[in-house]
């Protein structure tokens, strides 16, 4: 975790794509977290923020990894003992993730996808609108050039860069 005194009443999670510079590849493939797709090389940052939009923790994955695959690991990195609600977008709609969140004695606020048979009666739509805090955190992170475009060959080096940018966001408090 990046900070111990966070407001953990609500936790918001999301992921964003980061373009990788053409010279950032070439290291050991297991230590890179860069994938190739039609859009080019990319890495994905999965971020958890507190009720004020301050970064709590993050995980890097290759750019083609689906959000719901990384979500249980991201949720495990956050201390949810004092958290009432964990909020995420439709990309995290999974019964396995909902069960994982319930095991932590936290309520989920994740809308169901359109093709699901369950309803969205459980949703707190006013709280869901506050989810923009995690999007704003990504915007703040991407203000740093080294985060917005990945230049590092190794995953560990880029992780350190993102952690430093998260620390700068906390310092502004």
Place the predicted regions along the sequence by residue:
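Basic, amphipathic alpha-helical segments enriched in Lys/Arg and hydrophobic/aromatic residues
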Residues: 99-100, 104-106, 124-173
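Polybasic low-complexity intrinsically disordered regions
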Residues: 1-113, 126, 165-166
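A generic, residue-level signal for flexible/boundary positions that often mark functional hotspots
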Residues: 7, 28, 122, 145-148
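Positions that flank functional sites
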Residues: 115-116, 156
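Short, charged, surface-exposed secondary-structure boundary motifs
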Residues: 117-123
């Amino acid at each position: 975790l990046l900070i111990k005194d966070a407001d953990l009443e609500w936790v918001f999670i999301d992921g964003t794509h980061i373009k990788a510079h053409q010279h950032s590849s070439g290291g050991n493939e297991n230590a890179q977290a860069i994938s190739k797709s039609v859009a080019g090389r990319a890495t994905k940052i999965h971020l958890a923020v507190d009720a004020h939009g301050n970064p709590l923790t993050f995980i890097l994955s290759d750019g083609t990894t689906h959000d719901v695959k990384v979500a249980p690991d991201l949720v495990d990195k956050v201390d949810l003992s004092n958290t009432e609600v964990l909020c995420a977008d439709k990309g995290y709609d999974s019964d396995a993730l909902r069960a994982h969140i319930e095991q932590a004695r936290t309520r989920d606020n994740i809308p169901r996808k359109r093709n699901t048979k369950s309803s969205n009666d459980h949703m707190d739509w006013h709280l869901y609108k506050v989810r923009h805090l995690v999007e704003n955190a990504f915007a703040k992170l991407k203000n740093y050039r080294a985060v917005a475009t990945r230049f590092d060959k190794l995953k560990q080096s880029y992780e350190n860069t993102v952690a430093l940018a998260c620390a700068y966001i906390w310092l502004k408090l």
